[in-house]
Amino acid sequence: MAGSVGRERRAGAARWLPWVLLALGWFATIQVRPLLDPDEGRYAQIPREMLASGDFITPRFNDLKYFEKPPLQYWATAVMYAIFGFSEWTSRAWSVGLAFACLALVFAWVQRLYGAESALTAVAALGVSPFFLVIGHLNLLDGAFTFWLSAAVLAFTLAQVAPPGAAAERRWMLAAWALAALAVLSKGIVVGVLAGGALVLYTLIERDVQTWRRLHPVAGVGLFALIAVPWFLLVSLRNPSFPAFFFVHEHFTRFLTTVHQRVEPWWYFLPLLLAAVLPWLVPLARATRAAWSDPGLPSVAVAAPGAATRFRPLRFLLVYAAVILVFFSASGSKLAPYILPMVPVLAALAGAYLRDPARLARHAARAAAPVVIVAAAGLLIYSARRNSYVPYEAWRWALAAVAAALIAALASFHRHARPLATVLVAALGAICAWQFLMCEYTVIPPARSAKALVAAVRPFLSAHTPLYSVGQFRETISPYLGRTLQLVDYEGELRFGLDEEPHRRMSIEQFAERWSAESSAVAFFDPGVWDTWRRRGLPGRVLAADNFTVAVSRL
């Protein structure tokens, strides 16, 4: 009896050990890299202000109303701050953590439908995707959004392959509605366009109306509304201008116009998608062709008795990925992370058909090594040419990245290694190598974070020192200072908040008058603006400067 219990414990530990090792690799540099402008600073600061004010309904950025995105990530990060305090890792924990959870999500779904070997192949594919690894390690909304949306879509497919009328169908469908609500609270109503568009298109292609009859809309919509609606209702009641800005400006106007100034050609996402799937491009192409021509697999259950067609999960995932690509390619606003939700489902598709984790992992590890070497060397050459020197830290991170990639590549030649070990080494090599490249990038000038600038200025500040941001707003200054700034002659993404509270605006002339009267103050200037006003005789002493900001003291 005791021996049996011991064996079970060892087996349980063996099952969890790979995930523990992957997690250690995944979170290795979460605290090492400084927050980067602009997004990481923004999504670190808004939760800090929520926690400081106690207002978890109306998001504020630099103490101005900020309604571009829903609050789920703000809430989660504020909880992290309340428990552990502000730091790089607490600001990134939610987004980076849920990006990591995508690995477990894909594994669980593929294993349930297609077996353990396919599941391991899918994890290998996702774990070596350069695009997924880079975006997944940044404090953006896209990592968490990708998890919730992917979970909703995969839960929907599990409901559709369950026996009609079974408890599993209802359970998975309600889970899909709840997960979709969390996706809406992560990034907005685009969830309906992507998931709903995929459902409509799939139905038209398959001529399968049975899918619609199994949505459990009454209970599902009720659950969805219970989770998603309260915040939208409360924020609208407190801020009557919210609905027009959020639903119209941030969704319809963003898609139909170029007002957000993120104009890119229609093919913008194609090379990014190639970067995402490059290590497993050939298996994916074969899986895509197979999913379209013969999308059913023996391990997939289920059509309703007498139905002319059955639900085909892999074909649905393929349609869903295509909807994401086409929708964002047609949009007037394009940013690289928008297509991140494609990557987990494409990895699941590749894994379901290839069913050879060791082969995929070996190929990916060998292909990644030269790419990492070129990238590491390219960053060093860039620094040498632009800055006339290469920081010591850049050399260190470059060597670490190359070492991680080479170790994984060399290990791939061990033909007798178990598939799990082969996948684990390849994934850890890729995860670490791309993180180390990100670290190399951050230490090469110009500074892409205000962390060092703030550290140089902090000794000259007191809790009551007036702070100004003149001609610019650098997003990482506020979270590292733990303070908000008075904007001077600048609007940018804070224009809506300034329109809501016009008394918060300050012209450069008003600033100059107040600055001259101050006995103690610090201003963060755009370098060009500082040069102009210094020549005009504006008093001040430069405390610190980098390529983007000049910190000036009134003293």
Label every PLM stretch briefly:
Residues 2-8, 170, 174, 287-555:
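Membrane-embedded architecture of ER/inner-membrane glycosylation machinery
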Residues 2-362:
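Membrane-integral, polyisoprenol-dependent glycosyltransferases
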